[in-house]
């Protein structure tokens, strides 16, 4: 059974698309219609206010003029994002009880970038690379940005990064789903004691990579032996405080269904999904690699923005919960 295991060589079949879980979703009351488009400034204002030179580390600066232009475009405050979909609240049923006071709703934005590994191009000598097994050889490949609607083919190698919009503690949960709508057991795949030493605290602009670049396998291999396997459901949770009853282990661990269901019922909200109009195919940057490797390093105003933005309407002071799917291409 495919799982998102980082420390051992397993295979995963996936394609990142938008979804509604196969259960009865509750609609948020009085949710305003979504904006048809946004700019990266809507997201970047969540980051620390200091704005260093785009290439704070000289070793990150590319030699190619085209590459420099591409990276500069990723940090442009006027970068445009188009609305892809609105996801209903993942609550399994409407709330049966009326709150004592009318809840206050706020909007927060989570950044996600999906990456597909490939050999580096001649003008990408600055791009960080990952060791890849190609037959009996080991090669160094880089990763290129792809949109949330990308359909990955069998054998693609994929990663994703998550940028936090707030200070708190981040958790990433995964479970399989199948063509008949059934789902597998959920697993907590981040944090573990092997990732960042178990430290899952994040601040505005913190970038988290999955899988970690220092893992035995720093990518997911898109492949499956099950014909009824349809993909993976991923849930990102950022809580103001550490979640109770979560004891970290060296590897990912199973999470009780009732725990995930309670999170969905308590924290689920309407999610608007936006993909950038540009940036597809641009290789991983040294700035992003530096941000994921240094826990105290946050992305700042003029540094690369994510390829996909999830705009979430949630109740004030509650954990942020963002769902997305890794869909398998039909065989």
What is the predicted function of each stretch?
Residues 6, 23-25:
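Secretory N-termini
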Residues 9-21:
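Bacterial N-terminal signal peptides
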């Amino acid at each position: 059974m495919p799982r998102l295991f980082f420390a051992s060589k397993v295979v995963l079949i996936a394609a990142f698309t938008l979804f509604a879980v196969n259960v009865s979703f509750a609609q948020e009351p009085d949710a305003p219609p979504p904006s048809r488009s946004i700019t990266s400034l809507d997201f970047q204002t969540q980051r620390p206010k200091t704005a260093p030179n785009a290439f704070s580390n000289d070793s990150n600066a590319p030699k190619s003029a085209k590459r420099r232009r591409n990276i500069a475009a990723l940090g442009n405050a006027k970068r445009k994002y188009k609305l892809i979909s609105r996801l209903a609240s993942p609550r399994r049923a409407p709330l049966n009880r009326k709150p004592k006071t009318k809840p206050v709703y706020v909007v927060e934005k989570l950044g996600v970038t999906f990456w597909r590994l490939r050999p580096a191009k001649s003008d990408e000598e600055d791009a960080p690379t990952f060791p890849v097994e190609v037959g009996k050889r080991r090669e160094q490949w880089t990763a290129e940005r792809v949109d949330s609607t990308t359909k990955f083919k069998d054998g693609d190698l994929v990663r994703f990064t998550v940028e936090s919009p707030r200070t708190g503690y981040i958790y990433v949960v995964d479970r399989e789903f199948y063509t008949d709508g059934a789902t597998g057991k959920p697993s907590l795949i981040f944090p573990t004691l092997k990732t960042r030493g178990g430290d899952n605290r994040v601040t505005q602009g913190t970038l988290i990579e999955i899988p970690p670049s220092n893992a035995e396998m720093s990518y997911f291999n898109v492949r499956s032996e099950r014909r009824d396997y349809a993909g993976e459901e991923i849930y990102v949770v950022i809580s103001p405080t550490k979640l109770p009853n979560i004891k970290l282990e060296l590897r990912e661990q199973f999470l009780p269904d009732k725990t995930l269901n309670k999170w969905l019922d308590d924290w689920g909200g309407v999610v608007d999904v936006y993909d950038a109009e540009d940036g597809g195919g641009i290789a991983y940057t040294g700035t992003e690699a530096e941000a994921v490797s240094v826990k105290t390093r946050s992305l700042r105003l003029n540094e690369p923005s994510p390829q996909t933005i999830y705009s979430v309407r949630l109740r004030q002071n509650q954990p942020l919960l963002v769902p997305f799917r890794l869909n398998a291409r039909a065989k």
